[in-house]
Amino acid sequence: MCIRDRFARDLLSIVDGRLVWESLVERVSSISGPVWLTFDVDGLDGSLVPATGTPVPGGLSHWGSVELIENLFASGNCEVVGADVNEIVPGTEGSLTEFSAALIATKIVACHIANSESKIGE
């Protein structure tokens, strides 16, 4: 599988954003083999992560990110062997960035635990 860039404007476009989003979710669901999941918080909307190297207006929403993570783990085609959440630049903006990153990390861990438990039950 190759790596592709996705632009927020393509995902959020009123005209065809939903189709592009569904295509992205489908691609994530079809990933197979061992996967290292790297989540750069600067891909989130800048209002969620003001303390990052490159805050992006119009980036991914929290719930969009959760949907992608859940679909990756639920696909059954891949095994997430590790993960990291990065691009956090602690500053004086408060703790919103760290909190947003912690929510994403918690979702990754929860999905990993749920996958591990479902494999034990098989």
Where are the regions a protein language model picked out?
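Catalytic cores of soluble, metal-dependent hydrolases
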Residues: 6-122
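Conserved small/polar residues in nucleotide/adenosyl-binding loops
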Residues: 1-5
